[in-house]
């Protein structure tokens, strides 16, 4: 019985270990640094809120704007594991990444489903602190663009209010939607 307990404890401890990312020649490191507004107040109930990190996707495109590959995407959008979404798949969360992938699902939307999630190889928990993403360019790829799309839930303002209704030009998913649109950053890589 003690042996089983020790094995279980050892398994639990090793599963919590963070893997170190090793970089080789030709690998690129993208660093995401947490700023003052990185964690956002997400309303829960009765005026209680929690600090929420943004949803994000990192991908590469060729110089003509054609999608090459997803490097990283946050777990919630990759697996549709939203908290209290009521079935809303949050198509407004990362619209640029969703559309550039050109993967259309049975319901007509361009974002992964619970039945067809993205692989663990490109998805991960939403980081709450600074973090790095590793890119290993394909053999012979010398010039390409790295894009990062970032979006906060419930980031409403006077132009994108929570009160906007479906069909309004400024509708962004309702009271638990995005509010302001996602932001996309791009950098050209020339090896």
Which functions belong to the PLM regions below?
Residues 17-19:
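Bacterial signal peptide processing site
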Residues 161-191:
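Short beta-strand elements
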Residues 27, 53-57, 143-145:
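Exposed beta-strand and adjacent loop surfaces of beta-rich binding modules
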Residues 30-51, 76:
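Short amphipathic, basic-aromatic surface patches that mediate peripheral association
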Residues 50, 61-163:
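Structured domain cores in non-transmembrane regions
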Residues 12-15:
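C-terminal motif of bacterial Sec signal peptides marking the signal peptidase cleavage site
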Residues 1-2, 58:
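Bacterial N-terminal signal peptides that target proteins for export
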Residues 2-10:
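Sec-dependent N-terminal signal peptides
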């Amino acid at each position: 019985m003690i042996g089983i307990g020790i094995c279980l404890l050892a398994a639990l401890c090793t599963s919590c270990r963070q893997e170190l990312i090793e970089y080789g020649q030709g690998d690129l490191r993208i660093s995401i640094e947490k700023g003052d507004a990185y964690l956002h107040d997400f309303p829960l109930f009765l005026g209680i809120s929690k600090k929420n990190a943004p949803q994000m996707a990192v991908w590469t495109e060729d110089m003509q704007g054609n999608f090459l590959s997803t490097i990283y995407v946050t777990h919630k959008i990759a697996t549709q594991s939203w908290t209290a979404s009521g079935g809303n798949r949050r198509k407004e969360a990362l619209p640029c990444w969703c559309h550039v992938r050109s993967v259309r699902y049975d319901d007509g939307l361009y974002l992964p489903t619970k039945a067809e999630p993205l692989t663990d190889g490109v998805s991960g928990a939403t980081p709450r602190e600074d973090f790095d993403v590793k890119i290993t360019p394909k053999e012979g790829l010398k010039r390409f663009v790295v894009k990062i799309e970032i979006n906060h839930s419930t980031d409403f303002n006077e132009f994108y209010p929570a009160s906007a209704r479906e069909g309004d030009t400024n509708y962004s998913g309702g009271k638990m939607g995005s509010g302001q649109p996602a932001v996309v950053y791009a950098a050209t890589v020339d090896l």
